[in-house]
């Protein structure tokens, strides 16, 4: 099915974007998958604070959702990145934030560097099963003492012959409980700067690896998040992605895709909340008339819909820059910053307009409100985005 969707026809092209009729057919396939395989079970998975990743990912892999822009040689479809962008928008239809986040880790966070810089053997062993959905993977970068300061990581991988011996801890790792392998950023040479780090594939069945604990979160409950421990974990040097000491650079490169799809998903999710709120305000009557007839309410909803459209178009602009083969770090950082702030405002206003009903867990607004808070923290906090943008604009003070 996935191959059939990847036609190159330009009929039905959306002006100003890279979307074609083929992308629309792909969207419809994703919507059916969400309606049949995810949304009917979301409430139960949220209550359990975990979802069956191997089962869901296998079904997603059968549709080709994890290999859209990856080579056919490794099970991908070799499509343009607009398919990934379409997927990010459609996943906002999932009735929670955790499952789209978990899927995004698989497609846009844990595997891009492996695809670009990994050896053929490494791709066959780890990338191919991830694309098929036969393996769940995770990106293990963040540490408790570092957060967004990636250059400060302390987890180390010491060379011992043809192996690395890994020691350290990772924190707030999405898919960490269920992952079959990790894309780990570790320090392979001593120091405290970004130099000397490497990306290494670590199978989670390796002796010495353990999940210290599954973490409880404010939102995104269905997605498991874990603290990971590496106690003399031995993996072959052949598991290193690319050159030794280049891991930080590789990681920074794949952050841009992560930030772009996060911003696109936020725009689609914010629009979903606003449309839900509009329908609620049309049906809810106070003081003898529908809420939607209050000027403050329909003006505010209109303003936020405009802001969402601006964000969406900024993301599409990133796609056009990518099509030209140019760097879009500045624009992706702007989109990510705007997305985190806007989705929080939308969630807050929409909950307010729902009144007491919005505060009840039995109604989805409470979940969306909780889930929305993460975007200004994960994938680079707002403050990190501001720092990046300031450097591009030439207004950051010299270090």
Please describe what each predicted stretch is.
Residues 79-80, 149-151, 175-180, 193-196, ...:
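Short glycine/proline-enriched turns and hinge-like loops at secondary-structure junctions
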Residues 152, 205-236:
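Flexible, small-/acidic-enriched active-site or ligand-binding loops
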Residues 103-104, 130, 145-148, 172-175, ...:
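Short Gly/Pro-enriched turn/cap motifs at secondary-structure boundaries
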Residues 154-156:
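Short, surface-exposed charged micro-motifs
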Residues 1-97, 104-105, 117-122, 129-134, ...:
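Alpha-helical interface subdomain recognition
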Residues 111-117, 139, 151, 191:
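Flexible, glycine-rich active-site loops centered on histidine and acidic residues
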Residues 133-141, 185:
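A short, Trp-centered hydrophobic/proline-enriched beta-strand micro-motif
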Residues 162-163, 167-211:
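A short core secondary-structure module
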